[in-house]
């Protein structure tokens, strides 16, 4: 039993040894090509971890709201991404489902991190803690770390990512570390306040350049012991760690 196939012009003829078969039109190869101008590169979706607050007295008094700072949204937009605010309650409900539609996550600033996550009891100098927010962030953060998803931390976000990787923090810089620098500036937050030294060979140095840079400063906690695969990329003149990244490129 044999099958033969022949192509004549734009027609293909298929026959078997018994004489059965069919003839049909064949589209030219060019018909299957996609025009270059029709291809669109999808913008990366960046999930921004949300926080909550209760409204002031009034019509909606005590109503709990989820929020994401507009600065984070604008920064993602200005750098070619699509920002997606992630409610805290959703982080615990389905972290993998949320991350399935994200290309990276941004962990923002916020209140002090619960020291239980790095094996300590709260010291007298610790400020506001939001246990429900920390629980939600860690649910999403652990899933993102397991998936190898890129993560960018800002302020509390840096401290969170370090603890996520097994590191710990100074609960209060001024009582646990020698320092001559005011890290919690009284100036409006957009003003530059002190200097940091960005280390050669780091990803941060590739972006901003190694050496001395002026920054603002709004924190009283800081990374103490770097976590697994964590690289210190910038320090203040008093040795306080101001920026970190991971050696595997996941924490940027």
Regions found by a protein language model. Name each.
Residues 22-152, 163-170, 174-214, 220, ...:
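N-terminal beta1-alpha1 cap of cysteine-dependent amidohydrolase-like domains
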Residues 16-17, 53:
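Generic extreme N-terminus detector
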Residues 5-6, 249-252:
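Short, intrinsically disordered, charge-balanced linker/junction segments flanking boundaries
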Residues 155:
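Conserved G/P- and acidic residue-centered "switch" motifs that form tight phosphate/ATP-binding loops
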Residues 9, 19-24:
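Residue-identity detector for glycine
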Residues 158-161:
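Hydrophobic, aromatic-enriched interface-forming segments
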Residues 1-16:
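Single conserved hydrophobic/aromatic residue that forms the stacking wall/gate
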């Amino acid at each position: 039993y044999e099958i033969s196939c022949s192509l004549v012009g734009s027609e293909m003829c298929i026959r078997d040894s018994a004489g059965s078969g069919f003839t049909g039109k064949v589209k030219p190869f060019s018909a299957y090509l996609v025009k270059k101008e029709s291809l669109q590169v999808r913008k990366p979706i960046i999930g921004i971890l949300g926080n909550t607050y209760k409204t002031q007295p009034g019509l909606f008094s005590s109503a709990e709201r989820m929020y994401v700072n507009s600065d984070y949204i604008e920064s993602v937009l200005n750098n070619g991404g699509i920002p997606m605010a992630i409610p805290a309650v959703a982080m615990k409900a389905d972290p993998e489902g949320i991350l399935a539609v994200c290309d990276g996550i941004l962990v923002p600033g916020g209140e002090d991190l619960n020291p239980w996550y790095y094996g300590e009891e709260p010291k007298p100098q610790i400020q506001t803690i939001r246990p429900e927010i920390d629980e939600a962030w860690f649910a999403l953060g652990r899933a993102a770390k397991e998936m190898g998803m890129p993560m960018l931390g800002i302020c509390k976000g840096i401290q969170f990512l370090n603890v996520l990787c097994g590191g710990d923090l100074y609960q209060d810089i001024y009582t646990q570390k020698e320092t001559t620098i005011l890290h919690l500036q009284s100036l409006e937050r957009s003003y530059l306040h002190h200097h940091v030294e960005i280390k050669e060979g780091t990803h941060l140095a590739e972006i901003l350049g190694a050496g001395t840079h002026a920054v603002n400063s709004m924190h009283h906690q800081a990374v103490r012991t770097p976590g697994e695969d964590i690289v210190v990329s910038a320090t203040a003149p008093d040795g306080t760690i101001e920026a970190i990244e991971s050696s595997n490129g996941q924490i940027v």
